[in-house]
Amino acid sequence: PVTIEDQGSFMAGGVTITAPGVYKDSEPTNYDGETLHGDAAYVFWQRPVNARKNALIFLHGYGQSGKTWETTPDGRDGFQNIFLAKGWATYIVDEPRRGRAGQSTVPAELKAQPQDQLWFNNFRIGQYPIIFDGMAFPRDEESLRQFFHQMTPDTGKFDVEVVAKAMEAVIDHTGDNVLITHSAGGGPGWLAA
């Protein structure tokens, strides 16, 4: 078992925009002059007792959130727990405009678009519904359901620069670290590192 010395969460990076006009406290539905804080990353972190010097920062790929790093679809330990048990502090990121960092400064239309089979194929699990031989992906219905449910829509247009700036703030906040990215997280990761 892992003994956690400390844990918490924070928002990193982001911008503030202000609507034109003058804010009037007496008119709560008049948005003139109001501000919007958005495009920040959300970070959940844990530090085990006697943690190693460098922390590990995990940035997910497209269509995902920090959930990607927590546990596998069948409930086995994910990278977060595996590395905590090996003495690393872990910082699990939801990139701006996704998941728990959903406050966007740009509009987006969220569509209920059926695309489970696209995710199945793009993650190279197999050619839906057949799982490739030799895959560690579990073959039960509940695990597949869990996998599909963890897909997360963008709440604003994906912008590699916005994500990179937020990741720079995460990196600055954590001190000595190693940044680990998955798939579409690689571009912003390279820019931020």
Predicted regions mapped to residue ranges:
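Active-site glycine-rich loops that stabilize anionic/oxyanionic intermediates
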Residues: 60-72
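Conserved alpha/beta-hydrolase
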Residues: 76-102
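Acidic/polar short surface loop at catalytic or gating sites that assists cofactor/ion binding
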Residues: 101-157
